[in-house]
Amino acid sequence: MKAENEQRTGLLYGFGAYGMWGLVPLFWPLLKPSGAVEILAHRMVWSLAVVGLALLALRRWGWIRELLRNPRKLGLTALAASVISVNWGLYIWSVNNEHVVEASLGYFINPLVSIAIGVLVLGERLRRAQWVAVGLSFVAVLVLAIGYGRPPWISLVLAFSFATYGLIKKKLNMGGLESLAAETAVLFLPALGYVLWLGAQGQSTFAAHGVGHALLLAATGLVTAIPLVFFGMAAIRVPLSTLGLLQYMAPVFQFGLGVLYFHEAMPPERWAGFSLVWAALVILTWDALRTARRSRARLEAAAPTVLATPAREPA
């Protein structure tokens, strides 16, 4: 009963995390007339403030000494910070420049790009269904490129930057709050310097558009940290396969907002490209669930054998 309650709580946290990530396109336009770079700089500054307070409340500081003593981890943290800043900055720009649908595509194809990176960088071997999914996504990009009259570069940069970020995070092996604190700390001084420089040049929007605008810019820290905390609470309570399915909530919400709320154009060739991506994701999800089910069945079949084997006395 307790396990069921924990899993139910984890699902609620998961829905909360991916729901907030899916609805975040509604937030960034509220920060206009701030530009994408100014918003990104404030996001870095205020995220560190929020996460720093959270870590202070939780008394989780031991990791800092270990990180500072490990040059390799420091380098990977700096690299992760650079990659995620590209991802965040481009996403903010795309939402505020009427490219919400194309941005959502980036997060739809992100699992497929992660698989491709696994093959190219880590030498992983794909199952047949995974090859089919990757092939379909490649055809989808070609169809969308024809439809847009250009490669869907926003989608590709978002997908590859986030997949690269995931690869670096895998090597870092740090908790969500800790890694966010470390990454924003790396970029804190440049971000703060840029905010102060804008103020000195008379180009800052922070104090020029009233208290409400200043509070919204400061809220970028909460918008960044709260979904991450919810995701962390979900990750320890629900199976990874469930999280894998929940991750599609965010781009589904973003796509829906782009079409229904922001009224972005969806000509037939764009529908065709997205349909190919969705077909690839259905195949990928089916294959992942089938593989997980088979692995679980093998473990259950092996368990009685292990239990039935008599223990040998030490020689």
UniProtKB/Swiss-Prot annotation:
Main subcellular location: membrane
A Pfam family per the record: EamA
Subcellular location: Cell membrane
Membrane topology: Multi-pass membrane protein
Domain EamA: 19-146
Matches recorded under InterPro entries: EamA_dom (IPR000620), RarD (IPR004626)
Keywords: Cell membrane, Membrane, Transmembrane, Transmembrane helix, Transport
Transmembrane segment boundaries: 11-31, 37-57, 75-95, 103-123, 129-149, 180-200, 216-236, 242-262, 271-291
Example of a GO cellular component annotation carried by this entry: plasma membrane
Family: Belongs to the EamA transporter family.
Listed name of the protein: Protein RarD
